[in-house]
């Protein structure tokens, strides 16, 4: 027999980003996100059908940032990404940057590869994992890294074969 009160308490403690399948808490806008729930009951944040679609949106946001930064002559770094994502008028941007750098092990001035480049997958998936920890208030072990990968596949389906090869090579390296 299930304790309904326990389930209600557990659900109430779950972060908004997890409940919405929106791990980076992407705000509602005029964008018509692939995988968005038909009925949007949260007035502020997009609600997705699955966590994979939430991460698909996150990958697409990163790609948009990359494209904009290139057009503006800015490097694609954690500092520039987070400064755009969590501007100082609404956030403690410097604390957010420090936390992401610590959780992701990405260098502060490291110029990252574009999101649609499989060679940059490991670094950027680490970035998304760190941002999820901050946005959802969870530990790195609680982040659904499989959903990050599925989101990448949904965002960049043309790279699925190359990603499979990369993942297989990484798996073989760690399991020799």
PLM segments and residue spans:
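Cell-wall polysaccharide-cleaving catalytic domain and substrate-binding groove, primarily
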Residues: 1-176
């Amino acid at each position: 027999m299930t304790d309904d009160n326990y389930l209600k308490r557990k659900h109430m403690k779950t972060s908004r980003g997890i409940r919405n399948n929106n791990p980076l808490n992407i705000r509602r806008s005029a964008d018509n996100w692939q995988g968005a729930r038909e009925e949007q009951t949260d007035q502020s944040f997009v609600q997705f059908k699955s966590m994979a679609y939430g991460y698909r949106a996150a990958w697409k946001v990163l790609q948009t940032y990359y494209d904009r930064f290139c057009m503006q002559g800015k490097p694609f770094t954690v500092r520039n990404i987070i400064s755009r994502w969590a501007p100082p008028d609404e956030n403690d941007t410097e604390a957010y940057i420090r936390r992401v750098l610590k959780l992701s092990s990405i260098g502060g001035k490291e110029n990252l590869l574009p999101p649609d480049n499989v060679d940059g997958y490991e670094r950027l998936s680490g970035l998304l994992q760190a941002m999820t920890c901050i946005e959802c208030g969870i530990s790195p072990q609680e982040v659904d890294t499989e959903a990050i990968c599925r989101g990448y596949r949904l965002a960049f389906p043309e790279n699925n074969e190359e990603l499979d090869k990369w993942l297989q090579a990484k798996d073989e390296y760690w399991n020799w």
